[in-house]
Every structure is written in C-alpha cells, then in structure tokens.
Amino acid sequence: MDTAQKQRWAITLSYDGSRFYGWQKQAGGVPTVQAALETALARIAGESVATTVAGRTDTGVHATAQVVHFDTAAVRPAQAWIRGVNAHLPEGIAVLHARQVAPGFHARFDASGRHYRYLLESAPVRSPLLKNRAGWTHLELDIGPMRRAAALLVGEQDFSSFRAAGCQAKSPVKTIYRADLTQSAGLVRLDLHGNAFLHHMVRNIMGALVYVGSGRLSVEGFAALIQERSRLKAPPTFMPDGLYLTGVDYPGAYGIVRPQIPEWL
C-alpha cells in the first residue's frame, strides 16, 4: 500500500449467515458476505476495494462483531463507511463501527483472540422461530457433564480431534482461554474464547458435547477424545445454524472496541 495516497480502515460488521454462502467470494456470483461488502464499499469509495477479514465464516455461520480492514484513496468520514455503506448492503449485513487505523494494521494477523458463541435448542420439536438462529437436538441434555467436559478444553492443546479434514491451519495447537456453558429456558449457550480456532472446531466441539449431555459419551471419554488427536473417532460435525462469531480482540493501541454480545443472543 502507498501510505502517501491510501488510508487503511477497520470496520466491524454483523451478518446473518443463513442468507449467504459464507464469507469468501466465490465464482459464479453466489451471494457471499465479502462480495456484498466489497460492492457496497466500492460505491462509497468510487473505486474497487479489497477486504481482509479477521476470520472467514462458513455458510450459515453468523457474526455479531466481525472485523475487516481495507485500503482506499477515497477520503471519507467514518459515518460514510457506516451509514453510506449500509445503504448499499443487502438485508442481512450491517456495518456497526468504522475507524481509520495505522497502515500496518492487519485484521487477521493482529488479532490476539476470537470469541464464539454456539446457541443450541434442546427440545422434542424444533421451534420454527429459531430455525437458522440456533442449532437443535431433540435429545434431553444433562448440563452438568457437558460443563465438566467443556472445562477440559481450557489451555494450550492439540485440537486435531475437532479439526475439519480440509483445515488449512499450519498447526492444530491452539489455546482456549475460556469455555463456559450455560442453560436457560431450553437454550444452551457455549461461549469459547481462544487465540485462534481450527476449521469447524467449534461445531465439532458442540457435536461432542451433545454426545456427552445425552449420555452417549462420558466426560472421561471426551477427555480421551482430545488426547486421541484424531477426527476419526469423534462425533459428527454439528449444524452451523447456532454458531456466532461474537468478537475479535486486538491490542489496545489500535482502538478497536469489541461490542457486547446482543442481549437477544
């Protein structure tokens, strides 16, 4: 980037993943978050704009606080990158915040942590009002064992047992700082905070925790599964519907504030 001519901006956005085929642009013009965002940014900038995201999300996965950076020669106030861009975005995406950042800022590589929430409905019949908003199981779940199993995730570990076959991460070793599991009104919430996550890692963890909660896998079996470091013996990947990227952490010098998780979630 020519810093004499271009500015670097960081924006925080929220999106409904059920409306898009994931974050990344794809051939054939299928709707993706990146394609829609870059089209809207270009309308305000008056030039093509390329975006870099903190963490790519799959089809059906939502975000309440995704972070993206882009470079532009256009001189615009922050509100232009919020209200102006939102006026050109399709339903299902909204820019929440915009901030000019240092030229060396990188949305992905400067991130020190990421936060995910999985929202799970446990009920005999799936609520039509929660379709695409929460995962679902008809099984009755015992939250106690699920909490004990989730606690085993904390720390630096090899998470190969929860890694997708096509994962491109250089190493399966990641650090989980916090793993909290709560239940209220038939909804289970799994909150994970880690330095980084493998492809499908949260959905694979949730799949295993559902096995624990339904009695198909013991807490000891969950611990053994982690130590196996193999996807072959692990439960199936859980549905994307209930997965939300809820925040990305950065050093304070960048001034990027992580929004609170919405109360409805």
Swiss-Prot record:
Keyword Mitochondrion present in the record's keywords: the answer is no
**What InterPro entries does the record point to?**
PsdUridine_synth_cat_dom_sf, PsdUridine_synth_TruA, PsdUridine_synth_TruA_a/b_dom, PsdUridine_synth_TruA_C, TruA/RsuA/RluB/E/F_N
The record's Gene Ontology biological-process terms are: tRNA pseudouridine synthesis
Query: EC number(s) on record?
Result: 5.4.99.12
Q: Name the CDD domains on file.
A: PseudoU_synth_EcTruA
Q: Which GO terms describe its molecular function?
A: RNA binding; tRNA pseudouridine(38-40) synthase activity
Indicate the family of this protein. Answer: Belongs to the tRNA pseudouridine synthase TruA family.
Query: This chain belongs to which protein, by name?
Result: tRNA pseudouridine synthase A
Species whose genome carries this gene: Neisseria gonorrhoeae (strain ATCC 700825 / FA 1090)
Origin organism lineage: Bacteria, Pseudomonadati, Pseudomonadota, Betaproteobacteria, Neisseriales
